[in-house]
Regions:
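Active-site environment of divalent metal-dependent phosphoester hydrolases
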Residues: 12, 30, 48-52, 76-78, ...
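Short, aromatic/basic amphipathic alpha-helical patches
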Residues: 79-88
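Short acidic-hydrophobic, aromatic-tinged amphipathic segments that line or gate anion-handling sites
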Residues: 89-93
Length: 143
């Protein structure tokens, strides 16, 4: 069973926990207090403040120096500006598959007013598609 928790969704902040993955970090650190110790990877979609809060990223990086951050190339400078070490960042290319020990992921292109991606997540035979802030999803599925 895939466990998930919607921490926040909407224009004031977005953060979703799926198993031990946090997708988007547009909330205060206080809202993550019950989950931040249990996440192994933070996936980021784009730079808008309701998805990416620099103060929270800074605090996560400081509190959890072994925490991994995953994103497409356009987010790397933003993470480094928040004090995340380049050695903590997994950089993804759209359409490629990346295998971790207990899950895999593949970033998908989304259409927004800034560069944006979603994620296909694979947990064995189970799949999750995470997509937000997009004008279209033509041809996109969880396959």
């Amino acid at each position: 069973m895939i466990r998930y928790s919607i921490i926040a969704t909407g224009s004031k902040g977005n953060a979703v926990k799926i198993d031990d993955i946090l997708i988007d970090c547009g909330v205060s650190f206080k809202k993550l207090k019950d989950v931040y110790k249990y996440i192994r990877l933070v996936l980021l979609t784009h730079e808008h403040s309701d998805h990416f809060r620099p103060s929270t990223i800074r605090k996560l990086a400081a509190e959890r120096p072994t925490l991994r951050f995953g994103c497409c190339r356009w987010m790397v400078p933003k993470l480094i500006d928040c004090g995340v070490s380049p050695t903590q960042i997994d950089v993804y290319d759209i359409g490629k598959r990346y295998d971790y020990k207990v899950f895999a992921l593949s970033p998908i292109k989304l259409y927004h007013d800034v560069p944006n991606c979603g994620y296909r997540l694979y947990f064995g035979r189970k799949r999750v598609l995470y997509a937000t802030d997009t004008r279209t999803m033509e041809g996109i599925s969880a396959k």
